[in-house]
Amino acid sequence: MDILQGIHAANDYERSLFGAVKEPFRAGLNRRYSDIRPDQVNNKFFEPTAEITVEDIQAAIDQQKRRGLNYVLFRMNQPMHPPCRDSFGFEKEVMYVMALRRDRSRLWQTNDSIVIRDIQSSDISADLLDVSCVPEQYRDAAYRNMKMVLDVAETHPEYHWLCANQDGNRVGTVYALEHEGFVEMDDLWVEEDYRHRKIGTTLMKYIAEHTEGILYLHADAAATPKDMYAKMGFEIVETVYEYYLEW
């Protein structure tokens, strides 16, 4: 299995934990959906396997509307053909899949005052479900999604949800999923008042030292963390293009 096959298999496994189903939608176009996480867009998208047409896009929009959804998301490994993109006014985002193919984690600087706890070995549910930092209008949705993740993490030993504490305060969290020689790291978050204190790298090094396999993550091509990841030894192994439309 090459590195991209392994990463794709790990991604599919992670989605399956949350009930995401993949099925053919039209020729050259697959659909992924999940009824388990109603507030999550990530597990509901269309995935072309060939160049898509305006008709494909319209069919996907019609399908989403029939399901009572107000958006459509296409995720692909090539840019969308400009006439298709411009006909509908998609918002575009580019994501990099970055993998640590040669382990350099021993060189990462950490913060020795940070205590890291894993849902697999600690009762940290209250800390993980704390949504006080989320804007009030989004708290209910955030809590529901976190509770679903917590339920999966508590019943699947390969799924790690880590909490970083300093002086008794939760200052950061991250997910990690082990699957057949690959480890996906996702949703690295550090409390705003505690940033630039090596908390993120402390969480990442903990994952590298306590899991087995090639560590990989997804980084926004337009954001600065990708540059930090590159300095840490992560390499871009795939570029993913996302096209989002809401009505």
Language-model segment annotations:
Residues 141-189:
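A conserved beta-strand-loop-helix scaffold within acyl/acetyltransferase catalytic domains
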